[in-house]
């Protein structure tokens, strides 16, 4: 299983948008995603409630809800057959919570908007991930997503100069697009739309998807405790225990040719909108 954490204590950076589109992508690929909502606003939970019957299944956990009758560890259990756990964190996240939330994460994605305030907040966030959460650079688990960018603007160039100094891979550059608003309102993701409607946006996700495909999955024994606290992950029994299998291929009959190409893609290059000279090299393949 992969645990992918979307994290940036600065509100409005696009964590939820990226989380729901990742979940829908994995669902269409048949990779059994679980979407955990840690934000009291419940945005990802509301998005899940809008999904129509017949859409690819995504298991949801409203982890922000408090229930005095059960422990937090019990309430945040993950189904055993989950292959991709996507964690959407809250804004104004307290620094001391970082070790618990990022524990066992195979990837921590930090969305950054092109503004001076967001650049400063991202620098602090990444510093805390390194110093407080104790995630080492050489583990190649932290990556940045340049979000809602408008190419050829001065602030975009300033953002890319800043990201160059981090020595953290920039795995996607996503444009400011109304398509994200439209799909969210209908409980869908980009990868569930007709390719000719969202092709440009889908193409910008390919480097991120390729980078995530290189992450080493977690090998977690059934029933081990704790997902946001403790030392290991807490899991729910699967409805039908699944035997270990190779990652499901991306079906060209379901996905567009643009996205199905990810199945055989080489290690992720920089996005088309990203100047390769400003982007740290992609992480090497693990395992």
What is each of the regions a protein language model found here?
Residues 96-116:
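Inter-motif core of Ras-like GTPase G domains
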Residues 122-137, 147:
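Conserved C-terminal guanine-recognition region of P-loop GTPase G domains, centered on the G4
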Residues 182-201, 206:
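Inter-lobe coupling/hinge region of RecA-like P-loop helicase motors
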Residues 216-287:
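P-loop NTP-binding site
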């Amino acid at each position: 299983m992969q645990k992918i954490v979307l994290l940036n204590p600065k509100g409005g950076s696009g964590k939820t948008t990226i989380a729901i589109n990742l979940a829908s992508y994995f669902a269409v690929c048949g990779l059994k995603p679980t979407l955990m909502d840690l934000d009291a606003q419940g945005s990802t939970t509301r998005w899940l409630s809008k999904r129509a019957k017949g859409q690819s299944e995504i298991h949801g956990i409203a982890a922000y809800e408090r229930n005095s009758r059960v422990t937090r560890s019990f309430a945040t259990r993950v189904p055993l057959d989950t292959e991709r756990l996507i964690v959407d964190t809250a804004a104004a996240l307290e620094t001391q919570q970082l070790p618990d939330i990022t524990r066992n994460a195979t990837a921590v994605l930090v969305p950054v908007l092109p503004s001076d305030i967001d650049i400063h907040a991202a620098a602090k966030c990444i510093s805390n991930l390194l110093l407080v959460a104790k995630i080492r650079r050489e583990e190649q688990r932290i990556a940045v997503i340049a979000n809602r960018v408008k190419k050829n603007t001065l602030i975009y160039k300033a953002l890319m100069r800043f990201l160059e100094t981090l020595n953290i891979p920039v795995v996607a550059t996503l444009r400011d697009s109304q398509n994200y608003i439209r799909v969210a309102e209908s409980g869908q993701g980009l990868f569930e739309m007709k390719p000719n409607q969202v092709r440009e946006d889908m193409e910008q996700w390919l480097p991120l998807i390729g980078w995530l495909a290189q992450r080493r999955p977690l090998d977690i024994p059934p029933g081990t405790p704790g997902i946001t606290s403790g030392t290991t992950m807490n899991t729910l029994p699967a409805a039908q225990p699944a035997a270990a299998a190779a990652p499901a291929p991306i079906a060209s009959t379901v996905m567009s040719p643009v996205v199905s190409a990810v199945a055989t893609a080489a290690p992720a290059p920089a996005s088309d909108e990203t100047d390769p000279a400003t982007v740290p090299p992609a992480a090497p393949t693990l395992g």
